[in-house]
């Protein structure tokens, strides 16, 4: 095998979702390694003789034999999230005492905070976590800050909440291939919040910014 990694160029889809995946030109017989930045869904055929590893930002990685799982790992964000749909994965991360490993079971989600070093395992909202694969956004009593984070990744925008009282809101709904304005209009009708695009003269700003007030 060759050790050189072949990068897929930064893929930006029509809904502004992006993914960067790197993989060897040829895999070794006993291991398959890829490097992920962004969010990806993996379906890996079981092969006990060839370990599959997804390397993610903040010195974390996921090892699998045969499974389906979702990974959300952005270099510019503090958290790495892995949701296990089926099979079994082992999540590895750095701690003060060295490398740590945790096994996940189907239906579980692990969240690692690279700043605090804390790790949380919880029951996953699997359908919501993998809904992006089909162009869906699924919310169920989702706090507004989490909902806006989902929209931020999907549509490549930044949100600013200027009314602290709005942080008490949560939303339920399924949106299929809908424009951002339509989704925010749903939020407005159900909660009374308002939104507007913030104009800027900064030509270096990569993302649009939206005020929630």
For every predicted segment, state its role.
Residues 1-14, 18-213:
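A residue-level detector for the "anchor" residue at the start of short, highly conserved motifs
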